[in-house]
Amino acid sequence: MPLYQDEGVVLRTAKLGEADRILTLLTRDHGKVRAVAKGVRRTKSRFGGRLEPFMRVALLIAEGRSLDVVSQAESIAAYAGPICADFQAYTAANVICETADKLVATEKEPAVAQYRLVLGALNALAKHAHEPSTIGDSYVLRALAIAGWTPRLRVCVVCGEPISSALSWYFSIPAGGLMCAADHTPESEAVSWDAICRLSALVDGDWGELDGVPASASIQRETHQIVEEWGEYYLERPIRSMRLLD
């Protein structure tokens, strides 16, 4: 079987037979790859714990007819340890990996920007750089933005009215962003000015803004609900892990 080298992050695993696992990987050069890790569930597996979710690994993979086969794996960054030791970080990491798995639908198609975003988010969680749920929310919005679904947060999506704290604003997920009071539709929801500012910072990855003035619990709930609904609408299925970030 032809061999290829790459590096990747383990998004999820599934048991196969008595000792094997099917890995879903997001790789730097080959995009999403599904591969079998033979014997990985045995106590004395040569892979050790290198092929667990959230691990970044250098890989040698053999191409197969239906599934590829992992021949070698070496750890690059052991994100799993510090992430799994913190429940909130673990939950956010599951959101990230579930979203990446659903968003990158086609296998063996390069998705470099998505790969780099996943690495940055997992690295931030492992280092406890920011509040875990905020990392998760920011990742979801930025990953969807890379895919072409960026919420419009600076003007009304109907008339182009620039946003202002002096006006009332509504958010419509089907319409793709903010609506002014004159043009908002029945399905749109009123959104607070603080939530608009937080959503903008989440999309931009503006950690100076996000860390500088901590949002109240109510604003965090308001923005998290929008992020969850935005992800579900554009992925056309729920991000189930997000419910644990509430």
Curated annotation (Swiss-Prot):
Swiss-Prot/TrEMBL keywords: DNA damage, DNA recombination, DNA repair
Keyword Transmembrane helix: no
Entry keyword Mitochondrion: no
InterPro entries linked: ARFGAP/RecO, DNA_rep/recomb_RecO_N, NA-bd_OB-fold, RecO, RecO_C
GO terms for cellular component: bacterial nucleoid
One Pfam family named in its UniProt record: RecO_C
One Gene Ontology biological process: DNA recombination
Protein's job: Involved in DNA repair and RecF pathway recombination.
NCBIfam families: reco
Family named by the database record: Belongs to the RecO family.
PANTHER family: DNA REPAIR PROTEIN RECO
The protein, known as: DNA repair protein RecO
Source species of the chain: Bifidobacterium adolescentis (strain ATCC 15703 / DSM 20083 / NCTC 11814 / E194a)
Gene responsible for this protein: recO
